[in-house]
Amino acid sequence: MTYVPAKDRYERMVYRRCGRSGLKLPAVSLGLWHNFGHDTPHDTKRAICRAAFDHGITHFDLANNYGPPPGSAEHAFGSILAEDFAGYRDELIVSSKAGYGMWPGPYGEWGSRKYMVASCDQSLKRMGLDYVDIFYSHRFDPDTPLEETMGALDYIVRSGRALYAGISSYNSERTREAVAILNDLGTPCVIHQPSYNMLNRWVERDGLKETLSDLGVGSIAFTPLAQGMLTKKYLGGIPDDSRAAQDKSLFPSMLTEDVVANIRKLNEIAEGRDQTLAQMAIAWVLRGGGITSALIGASKPSQVEDCAGAVGNLDFTDEELALIDQYADEEQINLWAKSSETDT
């Protein structure tokens, strides 16, 4: 049966301007980091993407290494584009990234022009696209001049492979340098993608959040649910099909008794707001307008629907924020800290 998206999809979502650019992103975007590799049935992937678009989620975020195996998420999304979204390409924002290991040898990762351009070409081929809307440097490369990496992004945009350039997990200092280089080249940095959630607030400590506001660069926060910790999933133990059980970027050692007790308190605050814990966690990331979009992952369509519902209440009282701060102790869950380091 031919897929027909919900007619009221744009009424279900809030759209925010990405920095000072003309690009608007949905307040909730869908990331394909997990659950889009060979370990997930194709029909499940299609159902997740359909549910997202039906709820006004127009932004689909990928990277060359997403899988497993690396590249398989882009292959899967390319099939879904052809099967379900072929007539809606101009309604979609598709992004990809390059920075992590993809092939053997010295040119298979990091930030050289050689790797960045080849990676973009491979991503386009896997997805069957002429261009992506956003292409990112996935991580800072301490061994490649920043001018070279940003020059590669400039070339990728100027050659028509991407419409916008972005960076991911760069700290405040490196972000200022990267943005200045891109501005000089005439291809502005439109967006930054850092990890950010109640339990991982490095963007506040580092000053990155303020830096992005000062520079007029948009932001999309990945892991707003702390890899699933900020949901009800782990309140009663570790489910067999969960990330923690499978050691997928969340480890059982992170879920101590004290951590789970605090998450239960956060869940009570969410219930008082008539939200699920996931919805409140997303709303918290989006509070005050400092973050353009929250980038979610999902293993089933119902999770997409739940997360999209966060836009129904993005406001917090001072009392709610104080209570959240009381129980949302920062945990050592920033797996990307090394990518954000200043030292070279």
Question: In which residue ranges do the predicted regions lie?
Answer:
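N-terminal binding-site loop/beta-alpha segment at the start of enzyme catalytic domains
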Residues: 1-92, 158
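Short acidic capping loops at alpha-helix termini that bridge into adjacent secondary structure
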Residues: 26-27, 61, 87-92, 130-134, ...
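N-terminal small/glycine-rich loop or linker at the start of catalytic domains
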Residues: 19-37, 95-108, 131, 136
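Short, acidic/polar
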Residues: 40-52, 111-127, 175-179
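Alpha-helix N-cap and loop-to-helix initiation/capping positions
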Residues: 40-44, 72, 76, 107-115, ...
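Active-site groove signature of glycoside hydrolases
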Residues: 124-145
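Conserved beta-strand positions
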Residues: 30, 62, 96, 134-137, ...
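Beta/alpha (TIM)-barrel catalytic core signal, keyed to glycine-rich beta->alpha loops juxtaposed to Asp/Glu
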Residues: 2-12, 141-329, 341-344
